[in-house]
């Protein structure tokens, strides 16, 4: 438990919701969701995504929050407080801590890319560049080890400085401000995209149901993609959101709070597409997926756009907030784990964490240049690809399966205790009739995602 035996808590309900949503909202909301939606039939994919968000993402989110709120600690401490005597569920707490560290070993580098591009647009570095030159900027950045390491270290130090100021004075205060600014920025960017000449065509491609695209991909593939997206968008399974449950009060039920987090996460993901597709269609540029969408396709769009320097800077400021909100949220979990497992105070946990992650982030930052010969997943792969594979394909689904089994089986905490914690407070309740689904169907769905990710 907390070394001072006095658990910190959020200063407001809004703080909890915005910080938790900030943890869930990240780079994948922007560079994956819109493209997958367009690829798999537009509105058809969105409907399947929302269905599986309710069937899979929301239940596991309530489980992480319930374990945190009832156990009043980070993953390992919470498991130990709730597990039956003699059981070893708390061992998963070490995997949660390792998962958060591994995630930050590459996420800090990618967040640094966002800051780099924000300053490039702000200072006019893209002004007058041809499409080929604009595309080449990304490769030049990746090949520069000093630049890559510099921004990774800046993000790492900034994150621990924020968390070092405490839960309310640091994480909650900065998180609320940053998420509020993020939501304003995304609305401004959406409105601007709607004014572009090809906006209608882009919006139709993105949101209107298109059975030909869906059947062309195969309906089974559409459903599988929707399952994956709804599950991974919340970053469940490594205790990243569980820690915020431990800082909650019991005034409101967990299904209601989890639903609010899901709504914010989905809102940002959908809005990202409302920005990207009208812009790409207006300038006849095909939207890609992943880093190439953010760092090659969109800079080309902005350089062709009236006032592109401003709109590019605002977009990458939005991306900086989206990524950094995840960084500080996961850092808080790492700090809490270190405090509870090793008995450190917050200052020591921040100092050691900052030094450790600055070093542990080097393989990813140098994996595109000095250590580019290291290709752990085969030719053309990078250290980032390998680290992301371990987190996304192993630790997230595997950890979510552990949380689920802990909350619904008699060998763990048990369904009745889980639902009692879920339903404490005012708001929507978790009904008892979901028990068979949680015990016999949901584990199979998560296992399918886990196995599929390993194949």
Please report, for each region that a protein language model flagged, where it lies by residue.
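Helix-loop-helix connectors at the membrane interface of multi-pass transporters/channels
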Residues: 1-3, 77, 111-143, 246-251, ...
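Membrane-embedded translocation segments of transport machinery
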Residues: 2-6, 10, 172, 176-324, ...
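Transmembrane helix-boundary motif of multi-pass solute transporters/channels
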Residues: 14-52, 239-245, 256-259, 263-264, ...
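Loop-to-transmembrane helix boundary motifs in multi-pass membrane proteins
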Residues: 15-17, 149-150, 264-270, 309, ...
């Amino acid at each position: 438990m907390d070394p001072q035996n006095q658990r910190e808590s959020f200063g407001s309900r809004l703080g909890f919701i915005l910080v938790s949503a900030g943890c869930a909202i990240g780079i994948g909301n922007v560079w994956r969701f819109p493209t997958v939606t367009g690829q798999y039939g537009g509105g058809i994919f969105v409907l399947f995504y929302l269905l599986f968000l309710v069937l899979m993402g929301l239940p596991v989110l309530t489980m992480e929050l319930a374990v945190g709120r009832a156990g009043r600690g980070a993953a390992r401490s919470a498991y130990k407080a709730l597990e039956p005597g003699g059981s070893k569920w708390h061992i998963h707490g070490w995997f949660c801590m390792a998962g958060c560290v591994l995630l930050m070993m590459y996420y800090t580098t990618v967040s640094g890319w966002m800051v780099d591009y924000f300053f490039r647009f702000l200072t006019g570095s893209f002004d007058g560049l041809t499409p080929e030159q604009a595309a080449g900027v990304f490769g030049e950045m990746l090949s520069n080890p000093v630049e890559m390491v510099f921004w990774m270290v800046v993000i790492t130090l900034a994150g621990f400085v924020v968390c070092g100021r405490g839960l309310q004075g640091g994480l909650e205060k900065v998180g609320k401000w940053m998420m509020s600014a993020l939501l304003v920025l995304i609305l401004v960017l959406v409105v601007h995209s709607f004014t572009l000449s090809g906006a209608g065509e882009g919006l139709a491609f993105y949101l209107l149901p298109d059975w030909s695209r869906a059947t062309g991909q195969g309906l089974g593939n559409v459903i599988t993609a929707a399952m994956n997206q709804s599950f991974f968008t919340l970053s469940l399974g490594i205790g990243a959101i569980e820690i915020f449950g431990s800082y909650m009060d019991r005034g409101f039920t967990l299904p209601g709070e989890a639903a609010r987090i899901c709504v914010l996460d989905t809102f940002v993901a959908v809005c990202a597409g409302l920005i990207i597709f009208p812009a790409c269609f207006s300038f006849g540029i095909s939207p890609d997926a992943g880093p190439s969408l953010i760092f090659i396709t969109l800079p080309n769009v902005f350089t062709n756009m009236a006032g592109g320097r401003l709109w590019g800077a605002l977009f990458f400021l939005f991306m900086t907030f989206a990524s950094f909100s995840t960084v500080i949220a996961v850092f808080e979990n790492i700090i809490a784990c270190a405090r509870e497992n090793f008995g450190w105070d917050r200052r020591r946990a921040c100092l050691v964490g900052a030094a450790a992650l600055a070093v542990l982030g080097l393989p990813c930052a140098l994996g595109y240049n000095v250590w580019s010969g290291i290709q752990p997943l085969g030719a053309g792969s990078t250290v980032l690809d390998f680290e992301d594979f371990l987190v996304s394909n192993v630790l997230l689904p595997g950890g979510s399966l552990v949380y689920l089994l802990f909350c619904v089986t008699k060998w763990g905490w048990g369904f009745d205790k889980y639902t009692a914690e879920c339903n404490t407070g005012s708001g929507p309740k978790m009904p008892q009739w979901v028990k068979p689904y949680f015990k016999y169907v949901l584990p199979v769905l998560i296992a399918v995602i886990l196995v599929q990710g390993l194949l």
